[in-house]
Curated annotation (Swiss-Prot):
The active site is at residue 193. PROSITE patterns: DHDPS_2 (PS00666). This is 4-hydroxy-2-oxoglutarate aldolase, mitochondrial. Inhibited by divalent cations. The gene is hoga1. The record marks 165 as: Involved in proton transfer during cleavage. Homotetramer. Its EC number is 4.1.3.16. It catalyses: (4S)-4-hydroxy-2-oxoglutarate = glyoxylate + pyruvate; (4R)-4-hydroxy-2-oxoglutarate = glyoxylate + pyruvate. Catalyzes the final step in the metabolic pathway of hydroxyproline. The lineage of its organism: Eukaryota, Metazoa, Chordata, Craniata, Vertebrata. It is an enzyme of class 4 (lyase).
Length: 326
């Protein structure tokens, strides 16, 4: 990746983008700094979206100093929801939370046209920003050129700002650095959520784009401190669904330069974060939510609940790090 020649971005972009390139004088008006939980989607026993339990979760989350909410991200099981369900969840969240809470809605689809249509509809449903995951079904053909073309088309047609989303654990595809640098010059692409955890890569992207006001969010609480240390403006953290106050405290410590305290807190969040993401996934996240007073519940098929042994292991991880009593 790092040995690849970067696009001559300004020359390339001038022929791609419908609107003028972002410059030092045209920094984004919208800040996406802060902590965002990528909210889970509760389901009934019949695997229908439980909007009542969603509303209850949101009322509790509004007591935390989150900057906003990511709706229909990976933790929202968006891949298992219908088009109308995806839009209705956005509408319900917008209605339930204060206007100052930013709604970042996942509008990514596999085709460019479908992504544009979903983006427009999500904006109409109340999204302030859209989070667009990399298309990946034909990942072997998802070159930098293909991805720049895709995101440029989406951003040109989006009525709200666009945040790029790289999540290689789910897509098998890292949004290339050269593509990010090129796309950072589009006036309607304001940032990147990077869930890969490669701090060298994140630092390089920030170094190459910060003069444009491009904003990078860490995609996990597991490397939130590291992200802040290289210039990230915040994080989209699954663990914030469970330990919202603690993740926000870590943000505060980092922003205030209290690095020793931040390091100690970060250490206690690493294992729980890994447990509710890569190790046990959304079933683990929802189980932990239940323990901490939120509505997690079951997942939509084909995701299965944790086994009894997995539940014991998950609880042990939270216990040894001081978040649950034994």
């Amino acid at each position: 990746m790092f040995g690849r020649t970067l696009f001559p971005a300004r020359a390339l972009c001038s022929g791609l983008f419908k609107t003028p390139l972002r410059t030092l004088a045209t920094r984004p008006a919208l800040s996406i700094g802060g902590i965002y939980p990528p909210i889970a989607t509760p389901f009934t026993d019949k695997e229908e979206v439980d909007y009542g339990k969603l509303h209850e979760n949101l009322q509790k989350y509004c007591s935390f100093p989150f900057s906003g909410f990511v709706v229909q991200g990976s933790n929202g099981e968006y891949a298992y929801l219908t088009r109308e369900e995806r839009l209705e969840v956005v509408r319900r969240v917008r209605q339930a939370v204060p206007k100052e809470k930013l709604i970042m809605a996942g509008s990514g689809c596999e085709s460019t046209q479908a992504t544009i249509e979903m983006t427009v509809e999500m904006a109409r449903s109340g999204a302030d920003v859209v989070l667009v995951v990399t298309p990946s079904y034909y990942r072997g053909k998802m070159t930098s050129s293909a991805l720049v073309h895709h995101y440029t088309k989406v951003a040109d047609h989006s009525p709200v700002p666009v945040v790029l989303y790289s999540v290689p654990a789910n897509t098998g595809l890292d949004l290339p650095v050269d593509a990010v640098v090129t796309l950072s010059q589009h006036p309607n692409i304001i940032g990147l959520k990077d869930s890969g955890g490669d701090i060298t890569r994140i630092g390089l992207i920030i170094h190459k784009t910060k003069h444009l006001g491009f904003q990078v969010l860490s995609g996990s609480a597991g490397f939130l401190l590291a992200g802040y240390s290289v210039g990230a403006v915040g994080g989209v953290c699954a663990l914030a669904n469970v330990l919202g106050a603690q993740v926000c405290e870590l943000e505060k410590l980092c922003l205030n330069g209290r690095w020793q305290e931040a390091k100690e807190l970060q250490h206690r969040l690493i294992e729980p974060n890994s447990a509710v993401t890569r190790k046990f996934g959304i079933p683990g996240l929802k189980q932990a939510m239940d323990w901490f007073g939120f509505n997690g519940g079951k997942c939509r098929s084909p995701l299965l609940p944790l086994t009894e042994q997995e539940i014991k292991e998950l609880r042990h991880i939270f216990t040894v790090n001081g978040w649950l009593s034994s």
